[in-house]
Amino acid sequence: MSENQQHTPSAESSAPSQTLPAHPTDAQRPLLTDEQLAHLPAQHPLRAGTAASSPMLQALTGRPSSHRPVWFMRQAGRSLPEYRRVREGIPMLEACLTPELAAEITVQPVRRHKVDAGIFFSDIVIPMKLAGVNVDIVPGKGPVLDRPVRTLEDVRALPELTESALDPIREAIAATVEMLGDTPLIGFAGAPFTVAAYMVEGGPSRDHLRPRTMMHADPAAWHELASWAARTAGQFLRAQIEAGASAVQLFDSWAGSLGEGDYRRYVQQHSAETLEAVREYGVPRIHFGTGTAALLPAMHEAGADVIGVDYRLPLSAANTLLNGAVPLQGNIDPALLAAGPESLYAHVDDVLAEGSAAPSHVVNLGHGVPPTTDPQVLTDLVRYIHEKTTN
C-alpha cells in the first residue's frame, strides 16, 4: 500500500452519486443515430466495439454511468518515467508523427493509472506542421514559427492541409485504438484562436497582444487566418474520428485573454466551424479553455456537447451559467496534486459534490498534469474516484 493510500479518506464516506439521473428515455435511446453511425467506418469502436457503453461515453452524453469517469489532460507526458524513457533523444514533433511511438505514449497512462479514456498524444501545432508551415517546438520555450503570420498577404500564402498529409495521424489512431481495447480514445485539436495566436506572435506569449490587436486593426486578415486554423483543426479531428476516436476535445488554451465581446465577434464563429466539421459523426465534442468563466455560455453556443471547466470556477457555478444544460468536465486544481493526501482528497470530494449539480460529470484536472507530479498520486486518485462514485 502506498503512502497516499494509507492517508486516503475512505471511499465509503459520504459519496456523491453519479450526478443527477437522466430522463429514462435518455438512458434508453441509442448513443448515435443510424445516420450518424453511417458516417463511421464499420470497424469504428462506436459501431463494432463496446466504447458506446463505457462510463466515459455515457457521462459525456449526459447518461448515468457505473462510476464517475476520469481522465487527465496531459496524462501522457513527462510525469511518467516510461514516457521519459521512450522519448529520450526524440524531438516532440517527431514523436507525435511516429505512429507506433504516439500510440505507445497515448496508452501508457491508461495502462498505469486505469483512467477511463486515452487522450491522443499530439500537439496543437501538428496540423499546421502537416500543412507545410515551418514550425518547431523548442525545449523550454514551446512552439516557434520560422515566420509569423501578421498580414493578409501572409495569411493567403499559407498552404492548405491535404488529406494525404494526415495519414500518420490515422495510422497512429488506429494503432492506439487497437491497443486500448474497450477503453475509448479522445482525439483533440487546438482551437482556432489559440492556434492563430501562436501564428501571429510567432511563439508563446503572456498577453497575446498581437492577435488581439490584429482582430481590430485588420479584421479581414484575422478572420481569414482564424478560418484557416478552423479548417485545419476540423480536418485533423475528422481524421482522428474516422480512424477510431470516440470523442474529441477542442483546446482553447489562450481564450481567457479575451473579453466576451471580442470572443463572440472574432472567435466564436471559427470555433463553431471546427466543431461543425465533425458534427455529422455524432461523437461528443468537448470544449475547454483556461480562464474562460465569462465565456462558457458562448463556448457552448459554438457547438460543444460538453464544457471543460478550469480550476478557477466551481462546477456548480459553471452549471448555473450554462442553465444546467450540458455535461461538465473538470476541475481538480493541479496544484493540489503535490499538496499531500489530506488536502488533495478533501478538494476532490468538493469537486465531486460540485459536479453532482450538472447533468453528468467527467472528472479531470482544471489544467494539465504538472511534469513534476508523482505518478502514484494519480494512480491512487483514479482508484479513489472510482471507488467513491461506484453506484
Where are these regions (language model features)?
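The substrate-binding groove and active-site-proximal loops of carbohydrate-active enzymes
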Residues: E94-L97, V155-L166, P334-A338
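N-terminal small/glycine-rich loop or linker at the start of catalytic domains
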Residues: R63-E94, I124, K129-K141, L145-T151, ...
